[in-house]
């Protein structure tokens, strides 16, 4: 007999998460009657994902019955102060219940009780009846119910990403049992539920108290023995409040529910009525997935499989998709391609058609409308086909419209399309089972992808136009894709023998450090084992336990723990040194060797559509993460050399570009003046913040502190974060920040204004209309909202800086082509561009690169680019 599985869903919180997961597409999700449908759609996607993964035999969705519960009777302010529920969300709630009815899923609410109590009660009943239980919620309150029979999953991102809590996982993550999780909430309180807790007790302090005393009751039993402190005073004063908070936070597992497990059997949906409901909501893709006949849906896709190409199959309006079987288009295989012409769709797996004179000539002379141009240009270059810059890149268009989701065609289909598309993992399989099916089925899958691209292209164009983002696509992202493709194709020469020499040298250093660690430890052990290291440090050597936390797997030996221990224990400094050199050895010195191809070069891939700020990232391998602060990390750059003997590498790096952008955006007169006068910005800041009259009187420590404040402000740092960075008290850090804002009022005004704007719009923009969506900017959770506010402050700065570098790269590429230079752009790392320059062009090129970067855009402060050249990247940096 199959195991009984119960799926319990906190409907109120999951629906709320679904609403905000698709909040940025709110206006797109409307049916013909004008009803917003994003929460309904997102809720259905979550349900489908859970049903497929959990395969429950029984299921219930529990809802809150109203604002008045037994908890509000004992504490009137319970859940007080919550923001008003958006009307666009409230209007969808009845239809979510209707969706559940058509899906054959029981839903239930109970007067005077919350959804959590219904779930808790059914959870205990199901345990007694031998069920395996999965609980799903958007709030962490239900974590207290996890045990050997019950997994609690908390939605993290979008509609399909969850964090699964078991007792072991909770112990590993927080060092707590499920019962202690309730006590933690009693101590901390919960702003989203308006549970008071104990004054000034946060998560870290709460966990520390519980690890020492076991429970809330244990804390108060031992309170007399605690040393006098403000925390002790708060615990004593708020004792009644703490126990009230525990009662409020504890789920009632004996609620008087009027349903039983026998009422929750899941038998599947009412297909006919669910299909009608999808029609009413305008969910055409879901309707197709349900495979219900509809006048709006064709029975099968009309496309033509071709083995040869003629001119009448091609048009300047054709849309192309080239299918790669794998991720790395430098090495993985092209397996087929599809294109449109008028209302016809063509598909083939005959790669030799790329050499057909008619087709090759068309591809090389036409600016293509395509999905993922950079991939296609690099791929087709391997077949001797040299593409021009694109006319329209559908993948980049989607990225500019929304950075919340990935940019795969299946995602584009779900957000903007009507054609039902199976995602690649489902279609091809994964791991060792990944394979291409028989030809007709495979080409039909490609044709479905093309159908999505054809139907969504005009939608994406219209939305970009509405957002004022067409210039961002046409003048920045698409030209940049062309430049990046050329850089990737060029690659950079890497001397494997240099890496092998470094590997041998590092092995000696690692062996020496290992022996020194053994001597200080008084025994041999596995230095790479966190568990063995934890036992050695905290049991055998007796280092203070307050520096770590103990989980089920042992003592934490994370970097932050070791860094705090290093000043009092010489062995810890050696262990930190060991870890650094071992990481450099495995990840870079050895790791990079695997990425050197037959031409002696590394061809990294620049991911243009990943980050939410617009910054580029680098993969296969990641060259942006090569350590720059440690000399052992910098030495790796010695292996990166020019391809030709009579050439050098030239590195040009923007100086303090984010602070310059901050000066421009904030219009702060003092920051602008400092940059315009060419002052050392950190010295200038130190003088204003610390009241120093002359630059010569600014000490190295003053400048270091000012630098930390300058860059901290860019990232919305708190007094807590700054105090950690500088090793000072939070009071001192707060004083630094307060004085900074007094001395630079334009910056404070900018920060306040950009957060206000983000709350109103739900997003922020760079100088070039690049958007960063902030669905959590109005969150009821203080920490989540605070992170969104810091993101709102930083994103226009970091994003604008990234955009300026992109403009410089595009202009520099144009200048190199126009001048007929042999110089090639090879790498882009953070704010740096690396070029290979023939020595005969070096003088002219240094002037050209510097001028191009510094004149890429006109700001209210000058842009400065610093240059260095050398025989290796190390020397050029």
From Swiss-Prot:
InterPro entries: 3'-5'_exonuclease_dom (IPR002562), 5-3_exonucl_a-hlix_arch_N (IPR020046), 5-3_exonuclease (IPR002421), 5-3_exonuclease_C_sf (IPR036279), DNA-dir_DNA_pol_A_CS (IPR019760), DNA-dir_DNA_pol_A_palm_dom (IPR001098), DNA/RNA_pol_sf (IPR043502), DNA_polI_exonuclease (IPR054690). Residues 302-465 form the 3'-5' exonuclease domain. It comes from the Bacteria. GO terms for biological process: DNA-templated DNA replication; double-strand break repair. Its EC number is 2.7.7.7. Keywords: DNA damage, DNA repair, DNA replication, DNA-binding, DNA-directed DNA polymerase, Exonuclease, Hydrolase, Nuclease, Nucleotidyltransferase, Transferase. It catalyses: DNA(n) + a 2'-deoxyribonucleoside 5'-triphosphate = DNA(n+1) + diphosphate. GO terms for molecular function: 3'-5' exonuclease activity; 5'-3' exonuclease activity; DNA binding; DNA-directed DNA polymerase activity. SMART domains: 35EXOc, 53EXOc, HhH2, POLAc. Gene3D superfamilies: 3.30.70.370, 5' to 3' exonuclease, C-terminal subdomain (1.10.150.20), 5'-nuclease (3.40.50.1010), Ribonuclease H-like superfamily/Ribonuclease H (3.30.420.10), Taq DNA Polymerase, Chain T, domain 4 (1.20.1060.10). It is an enzyme of class 2 (transferase). Residues 177-270 form the 5'-3' exonuclease domain. In addition to polymerase activity, this DNA polymerase exhibits 3'-5' and 5'-3' exonuclease activity. Belongs to the DNA polymerase type-A family. Single-chain monomer with multiple functions. PANTHER family: DNA POLYMERASE I, DNA POLYMERASE NU. This is DNA polymerase I. The gene is polA.
